[in-house]
Swiss-Prot record:
Molecular function per GO: frizzled binding; smoothened binding
Name this protein carries in UniProt: Transmembrane emp24 domain-containing protein 2
InterPro entries from the UniProt entry: Emp24-like, GOLD_dom, GOLD_dom_sf
Signal sequence annotation: 1-20
Lumenal domain ranges by topology: 21-168
Coiled-coil segments on the chain, per record: 117-167
Assembly and binders: Monomer and homodimer in the endoplasmic reticulum, endoplasmic reticulum-Golgi intermediate compartment and Golgi. Probably oligomerizes with other members of the EMP24/GP25L family such as TMED7, TMED9 and TMED10. Interacts (via GOLD domain) with TMED10 (via GOLD domain). Associates with the COPI vesicle coat (coatomer); TMED10:TMED2 heterotetramers are proposed to be involved in coatomer association. Interacts (via C-terminus) with COPG1; the interaction involves dimeric TMED2. Interacts with SEC23A; indicative for an association of TMED2 with the COPII vesicle coat.
An annotated GO cellular component: COPI-coated vesicle membrane
Chain span(s) of sequence motif COPII vesicle coat-binding: 194-195
Compartment(s) where it occurs, according to its Swiss-Prot or TrEMBL record: Cytoplasmic vesicle membrane; Cytoplasmic vesicle, COPI-coated vesicle membrane; Golgi apparatus, cis-Golgi network membrane; Golgi apparatus, Golgi stack membrane
Required for TMED10 and TMED2 cis-Golgi network localization: annotated segments: 118-157
GO biological process: allantois development; branching involved in labyrinthine layer morphogenesis; chorion development; embryonic morphogenesis; embryonic placenta development; endoplasmic reticulum membrane organization; endoplasmic reticulum organization; Golgi organization
Organism expressing this protein natively: Mus musculus
Length: 201
């Protein structure tokens, strides 16, 4: 029989397999992150550019044999999942080399699934239903946590866009008001000079 403490420890271990990070990538720079897994392990990368330039970044996932698994150019967000094709260290890289001067802030999460079970466990006919339910609950909780983090980032991005647009509209309105006042004063001056009576002495 599985105790409550063992169940909580299993749930905590399952939730700990997903790591969320914010990283700042300077112009002309590349940042890489590494995960060592066994063959057959399910892995996933979820990312979103939170700040900087046109909110785009180059993404590349490479296997231990230097085989390209995924490559995306100028992406602002994305989700990609795959199963490890061999044992070893997998490389997740974000490149800002296309940017001339703007650093980018990228929020990303690397999800590492459970390692594949051994033959002796696969041959068992009966699996513990409680462990299965806890595993499903942990996956669902991780997905909700990721979705909440991405919603916060999107809300921050849209608020920054709204503030920027609002300040531009206010500045443009102020400029238009100044032009209107200048034109009004110019017309008054012109009409006043037009109706002036010039005396010849």
């Amino acid at each position: 029989m599985v105790t409550l403490a063992e169940l909580l420890a299993l749930l905590a271990a399952l939730l700990a397999t997903a790591s969320g990070y914010f990283v700042s990538i300077d112009a002309h720079a590349e940042e890489c992150f590494f995960e060592r897994v066994t063959s057959g392990t399910k892995m996933g990368l979820i990312f979103e550019v939170a700040e900087g330039g046109f909110l785009d970044i180059d993404v590349e996932i490479t296997g231990p044999d230097n085989k390209g698994i995924y490559k995306g150019d100028r992406e602002s967000s994305g989700k990609y999942t795959f199963a490890a094709h061999m044992d070893g260290t997998y490389k997740f890289c974000f490149s800002n080399r296309m940017s001339t001067m703007t650093p980018k802030i990228v929020m990303f999460t690397i999800d590492i699934g459970e390692a594949p079970k051994g033959q002796d466990m696969e041959t068992e006919a009966h699996q513990n239903k409680l462990e299965e339910m806890i595993n499903e609950l942990a996956v669902a909780m991780t997905a909700v946590k990721h979705e909440q983090e991405y919603m916060e980032v999107r809300e921050r991005i849209h608020r920054a866009i709204n503030d920027n647009t609002n300040s531009r509209v206010v500045l443009w309105s102020f400029f238009e008001a100044l032009v209107l006042v200048a034109m009004t004063l110019g017309q008054i001056y012109y009409l006043k000079r037009f109706f002036e009576v010039r005396r010849v002495v």
